[in-house]
Regions:
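Short, glycine-biased loop/turn motifs at secondary-structure junctions and
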Residues: 1-175, 179-209
Length: 209
């Protein structure tokens, strides 16, 4: 897509790319946050020169917690088609205007921490056949405070210890021939986490309502 001839409706077909990108000099390439900025700027009626001069993947009007999570998640997806499907126009259009006060930002921060400990980590523990550790983390109460995080420390440290041992054993045993099989085994977990991460973003967005 070329910025000079770009129309708002064209952005629904924009491929969401990995990493940050320079301001468009003709061809438009954008990560999820940059695409969210571009959609917002065009809806505001900005001219092309202003879009270029203020191009950003960190919109001031976007919650820093949501922005940071989206950037990290965006770059963790290796497939352009999967990334573009997950960061749909509807999701991108919800990113601007999400910045709130410190209390709202803290609630969203705890939501992200809770997701990482009770959902993301158990998924990878199961890949290492550490079912007991995965179940222990999933059984933790929702983590929404320093006290809850402190109470989760023993289960987290146990999972981290066993997970480190499993990673070391896997690296020692892995060979070139196992690469494809390992990728196949990982795919369902990655797919499930992508859906779960999208749900987290939508919950963080809804937290202000």
């Amino acid at each position: 897509m070329n910025l000079e001839s770009l129309k708002l409706e064209d952005l629904d077909r924009l491929t969401i790319r990995r990493g940050s990108h320079p301001a468009p000099n003709g061809k438009v390439e954008a990560c999820a946050m940059e695409a969210g900025f571009l959609r917002w700027a065009m809806r505001q009626g900005w001219d092309k020169s202003r879009i270029v001069s203020e191009w950003s993947d960190s919109m001031p009007c976007t919650c820093p917690v949501i922005g940071g999570f989206v950037r990290s998640w965006n770059d963790g997806i290796s497939d352009d088609s999967v990334r573009t499907r997950l960061f749909s126009p509807g999701v991108l259009d919800m990113l601007p205007g999400t910045k709130g006060g410190d209390a709202l930002m803290m609630r969203r921060m705890w939501m992200a921490i809770d997701w990482s400990i009770r959902m993301q980590t158990p998924a990878f523990l199961r890949l290492a056949q550490l079912e007991a550790c995965a179940v222990a983390l999933e059984a933790l109460p929702e983590i929404r405070s320093l006290e809850a995080l402190s109470n989760a420390r023993a289960a987290w440290e146990d999972a981290h210890k066993h997970g480190a041992a499993a990673r070391a054993a896997a690296r020692a045993a892995a060979g070139a021939a196992a690469g494809a099989a390992a990728g196949d085994a990982l795919a369902p977990t990655i797919s499930a986490l992508q859906v779960s991460a999208l749900d987290l973003v939508e919950r963080m967005l809804a937290e202000a309502k």
